[in-house]
Amino acid sequence: MARLIIILGNSGSGKSTSLRNFKKGEVNIISPLGKELPFRTELKTTLVKDIDMLKKAIPKTKAPVVIIDDANYYLTLYKAKHLFDKNPYEAPKYVAHTFTGILEDIIFLDTEQTFVVMAHIDKDSEGYKTFKTTGAFLKDDLLPEGMTNIVMESKMDDTGEYVFEVKRTSDRSPTKTPMDMFETDSVPNDLKSGQNEKPANL
């Protein structure tokens, strides 16, 4: 089975920057937007425009680490695509079911690959942080965080350094990782080192 990791964070919080130490062949990067990476690199981003294409692309990936960047936009684009051919109240359920199916496909792949889903974070009126969706109806039917035991938050710490928060520091935090996987509440913003270090073995 593949390993699924979810990384949530605001725009500019260092999600994509955490890929800076990967070399060509070590990682596949998939994006619905095809944005250039925010650092000089030989790595290329593969443009995969919608969920239907994503479903076909995932089994074809070869690198040990696969990044699905800007994952929220798959929901936005798919919802817009089916807005007029579905009942307005059924469309969110359809989108949620389809995206959940993608994550299930990843989990049950017969592979040792690690798939990292990067997405923007949402904060509700009570301060609870979750995977950002395209509306309340969709949020009711979609909880990607529940499909993995590794959810990290990309953020800036008190010293101005970009880090991944890996342990829940409040009941409103989305983060969770297996017990004893990490010794600290946060780790450096570097997914490559996380692949090689123990106990921080992503």
For each of these PLM feature ranges, what is it?
Residues 1-61, 65, 72-73:
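Conserved P-loop
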Residues 16-17, 39, 77-78, 126-128, ...:
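Short glycine-/acidic-enriched loop or helix-start segments at secondary-structure transitions
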Residues 40-46, 54, 160-202:
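P-loop/Walker A phosphate-binding loop and immediately adjacent motor/lid segment at beta-alpha junctions
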Residues 57-58, 74-77, 109, 151-154:
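Conserved, well-folded catalytic cores of nucleic-acid-processing
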Residues 65-143:
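P-loop NTPase motor core
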Residues 115-186:
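Phosphate-binding/switch region of NTP-binding enzymes
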